[in-house]
């Protein structure tokens, strides 16, 4: 039976980075994955260019029942550390918006970089490998694989969450946590589009593909100011994906379709300058024409000129466009979700090492635990930071 210092399960962002860093620190590491290729989710991310971190990473951008848990790891391995590594590999990158960093070329460059770092650390990578059983004794961990049995002093679970099952997502990590007595918090899809109830969806069907700047507020007061996209299933776009992580079934979200415009003042100015101009054409100066036409067809925008618009109508119009209350039917679920909310309870883990407090040698990193970042590179940075913290702990075990 082949023995390793550590076995890492999951060749995604966190798993590859942890294996590489532990290997380079002198540990003998086996990296396992059930897929044909490593880094499948990395390749799909950022429209194929991988939004690998964010310039503005801070703990406040992460959701967890323990909001303090992520602080240590994020402080010890920062976005600047990963940017430095990307630079050493000659990967050109650019900032797209809101601090989001993307490869100029392809997400494959990040995967290749991680594979190279694994090779540098002498990591043994085995793909298309199923972990059938995990057992623990005084000597560490024994894993029954499809075709062989291996053992190790330490076991690192980097198997991710439930989002994007088409890329191999599974509840494997949660099952291992429960097997060893760790609490797993309820999971749900995060960073995911909303679906709408049929009556509202039918009213908005002509808007599919229309994108508009917005400010969306959840019932807990959280606000995101980014674009909203109308789809044939409901609402999407960065603002919707962001707010979905703060939304609970049955709740409303409030949408401001004109976050950069004081609509009341704008209408008053236009009325003074162009009293005979139609209200529809005036609003089309600030909103997509298709959106204005749809709202007028629904009776939300009076078919009048500016001088005919009375104060009550103007007040109602401002309310409609800047305080639109929407109750989503649900979300599109794990199929299209970028992340999984919930997971292994961080109160069960050390924030410095990612090791289970009551199970020596068992570690959890990345998305499998209850730490979820905002859209825009934050979840990749958590993968790098939690993996680095774990790798340092593995190195100290020598």
What positions do the PLM features span?
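Short hydrophobic core segments
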Residues: 7-9, 32, 131, 150-166, ...
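Glycine-rich active-site loop/strand segments that organize a redox cofactor
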Residues: 49-95
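Feature captures the FAD/FMN-dependent oxidoreductase FAD-binding
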Residues: 76-154
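A glycine-rich dinucleotide-binding beta-alpha-beta segment and adjacent secondary-structure elements
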Residues: 127, 293-372
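Glycine-rich loop(s) and the adjacent beta-strand/alpha-helix scaffold that form part
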Residues: 154-200
